[in-house]
Amino acid sequence: MRLHQTLGAAVGALLLALAVPTSAHATTGDFLYKTSTGQEAGVADPASGRCIDLPGTSGDAPGHSPRNFTTSTATVFLEADCEGDTYYVMKPGTKLGDKLKLSSVVFS
């Protein structure tokens, strides 16, 4: 009887764990860039699949010199909210110069 109850509790716990929604998958590592004033800035362990408007940047004053030290591909956009036709895809480990301007990023 005791084994039956223990087995039932274990199966119930497993089903509950599978039913609870998980948080967004986080990318491991740092995404670094420079603001329009040249200050170093970055995002640590960003969530995947969610657009991030980069602090210290805007469409009128975008950041530059992105470095993708995360484990995921980063797509950087010139405009906020990951919108617009101007974007660039950065594989993990990619470093780009000050000619690439950005205001938002999404990781995949």
Language-model features and meaning:
Residues 2-108:
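Compact beta-sheet-dominated domain cores in extracellular/mature segments
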